[in-house]
């Protein structure tokens, strides 16, 4: 099998699975128990939190475990709106956000909030100036993703954070960094965002674990889940210790020689652009700078047909984010692409393990699809 869908999820290394297995079978105590077995697990949880916090660039007591990026996004948006409900009921976001953000904002619109949505340019880029121009005295929150999951576009979060200080210092800033964490270098302290959501399964950790950074400007954040008071009183529920252990181990593995891994992914992406650009009717979509995401379109050939054909050959690529119930995604729609191009968008995404030979095989399969299948659009 050739796996080129790392933006959807990633393989779990054996060392991560082993770390989880040890917790499941030997270190299974509840970390809230008061006897030594439980307190040992509490120390382990805090050690693992510190590992992840170091990679985020924050203090351990600023990082809260969640079940996924979607939970972190929703928690951040709701917490920001709660804190700033007296500032106003206006939110600024973009048309290319993950549905976790867009659908949460739609819910808030139904509750009486006003949402201003910024459109990208033809390459999928969002400028800090366009975001800041939409901020008003009553803007409670700005939510802009760090890296677009379909285009690989990197958005100027640090510039937005700096600009907000001059435009409206009360406005809080949230960024969905699920596709940015350990793929685009950043430090929470330098970035300046008030909320940063990350997810484990995009970097080799298991599904079901993520984290939310909450910065110092967030005063007395509203608890996500009332209950037993876990996660410093903000997210109750017994901690998923095995998933946390796996998350920390995955961070350690990815952090080791990270610069080399990012360089390799960037080289693989550049090689893919070169190989795929030689295929007739194939268009590179956007000019995203993230090293692991590449969207292309074989204009005239429906994306799901391409995905199915390559899948039957053991090559995993995605039309999922670029095709939603047979329609172009909000990201593709926002680019204003011709219909034939938009309907043919597919995504390839890479990991540290991706090889040039795998790109060769994918390119050959795509060329064969083009040469032997009639266009349908």
Task: Write out the residue ranges for each language-model feature.
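Pyridoxal 5′-phosphate
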Residues: 1-377
